[in-house]
């Protein structure tokens, strides 16, 4: 994450441009994700890439950038955002499309609200984003549900379960109409200041 090649002597003399927030772990993480070391950017290099090639995937509701660790700079573009899932898949709106009379009433109420023609910009945007999220959940969940069981064995750690969901998502690429995908998984806990041997053994 250097701005330019830097020697210790140059650093001490202040003779070179240095990364913003040098020695800050959070800044270093952001700079790796943005590929911009001299300022704080909200757009990452996978996001910039997706802005260019996202249209190669034919489902407009599901981004080619899929995160299993929430919001991140790396997959955020100027136009494209990431689609966040969990180790269990896409999270549905509670009871939407579920069985039973209560679920049916809720589903019809939500669909009715989202189908209204809103004049206020915030209302229009919220309705469009909510409709897209619901449709994306249906598309993603159906694609995963239609897959045969994986033969690859995964352990029961949180990280391994996330990799299992990534494997399922890749296996469902034809149903999801995906030609290009990126996946973001975060594994923390590496900032060991003491008891390094003991702490690293637990990693």
Regions found by a protein language model. Name each.
Residues 1-203:
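Feature for exported/extracytoplasmic and membrane-associated proteins, marking the mature portion
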